[in-house]
């Protein structure tokens, strides 16, 4: 299988993801956020980190990166896309994952289990 890991300014663990995917037999390509086209892939991964800084909705800036239209087209055509941590936030900001990211009522970290 072929995969692509998208790297944004502030991404971390993108290289770890590259190593892990290769360990499991993927032929992985690292893709810079300013690229326009994805390489032929079966899986696209948006890793964690702090794209454009450690702020609420920092994924909103990353969602406007040049590569994201190709990621959206890939997902809409049935391609597998995985977002980890900030990568998930980017997917929410693009509209590929429904929902919105908001500050909570108390402006504090809350950890609780939820059932989806």
Where are these predicted regions, by residue range?
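N-terminal beta1-alpha1 cap of cysteine-dependent amidohydrolase-like domains
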Residues: 1-84, 91-98, 102, 108-113
């Amino acid at each position: 299988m072929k995969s692509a890991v998208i790297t944004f300014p502030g991404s971390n663990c993108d290289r770890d993801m590259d190593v892990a995917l290769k360990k499991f037999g993927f032929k992985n390509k690292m893709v810079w956020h300013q690229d326009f086209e994805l390489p032929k892939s079966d899986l696209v991964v948006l890793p964690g980190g702090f794209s454009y800084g450690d702020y609420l909705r920092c994924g909103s800036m990353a969602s406007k990166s040049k590569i994201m239209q190709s990621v959206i087209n890939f997902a809409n055509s049935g391609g597998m896309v995985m977002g980890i941590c900030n990568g998930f936030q980017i997917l929410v900001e693009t509209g590929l994952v429904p929902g919105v990211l908001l500050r909570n009522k108390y402006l504090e970290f809350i950890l609780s289990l939820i059932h989806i």
